[in-house]
Curated annotation (Swiss-Prot):
Residues 102-173 form the SUI1 domain. It holds the Pfam family DENR_N. Interacts with the 40S ribosomal subunit. It comes from Neosartorya fischeri (strain ATCC 1020 / DSM 3700 / CBS 544.65 / FGSC A1164 / JCM 1740 / NRRL 181 / WB 181) (Aspergillus fischerianus). InterPro entries: DENR/SUI1_TIF, DENR_C, DENR_eukaryotes, DENR_N, SUI1, SUI1_dom_sf. One of its GO terms (molecular function) is translation initiation factor activity. It comes from the Eukaryota. The gene is tma22. Its main location: cytoplasm. This is Translation machinery-associated protein 22.
Length: 194
């Protein structure tokens, strides 16, 4: 019995897998995504040895020799379609980001109390919860993510900090949000007649 315990197997090592920096798949599967050319360039720059194994002339010719002519043509057409689709989606996304406005609204709560409401950050790739937490820390005030009646998520910050928030957003997220896309709005409550 004592001999069995001493002959325990060596510790199993986890396999190291390289993931593509463009599509986040292993490089062997990049060809099935829409960004095959970009993935290939990334692999060439970052992992030359793996690039040689997957995309060298010998590897490509051995893979193509196994396919029939009609299958090769179909594969080329499919790859071209996927690439065109990915390029169109990327262009639409860039256009949508360029047109999207981040609205910083100062809303009067009662008499001299105000809240600042920020909408449109998620379009620029920012997470509302993280930004709300950072705002709360930065301005030492309460901030939360709420759903507006329109169903859009918005960040509500207690206090009149709209101009400070604009400066802070440009300072921290200037790359994601251009200054021309940030809009300051003053929203006053209507007085009840009676």
């Amino acid at each position: 019995m004592a001999e069995v315990a001493q002959n325990s197997p060596a510790e199993v090592q986890a396999k190291q897998v390289v993931y593509c920096g463009v599509c986040t798949l292993p490089p062997e599967y990049c060809e099935f995504g829409g960004t095959a050319k970009k993935c290939e360039e990334w692999l060439k720059d970052n992992h030359a040895d793996l690039y040689q194994r997957l995309y060298s002339e010998e590897a490509l010719s051995s893979n193509l020799s196994e396919l029939s002519v009609s299958v090769r043509e179909r594969a080329a057409k499919d790859a071209a379609k996927k690439e065109a689709k990915a390029a169109a989606a990327e262009a639409r996304d860039a256009e949508r980001k360029a047109a999207a406005k981040v609205q910083i609204k100062r809303v009067e709560r009662n008499k001299r109390k105000h809240v600042t409401v920020i909408t449109g950050l998620e379009v620029h790739g920012l997470e509302n919860k993280k930004v709300a937490k950072e705002l709360g820390k930065k301005f030492a005030t309460g901030s939360s993510v709420t759903k507006s009646p329109a169903g859009v998520e918005e960040i509500t910050v207690q206090g009149d900090v709209s101009e400070d928030v604009q400066e802070w957003l440009l300072e921290l997220y200037g790359k994601e949000i251009p200054e021309s896309n940030i809009e300051l709005v003053e929203d006053k409550k209507k007085k009840a007649s009676g």
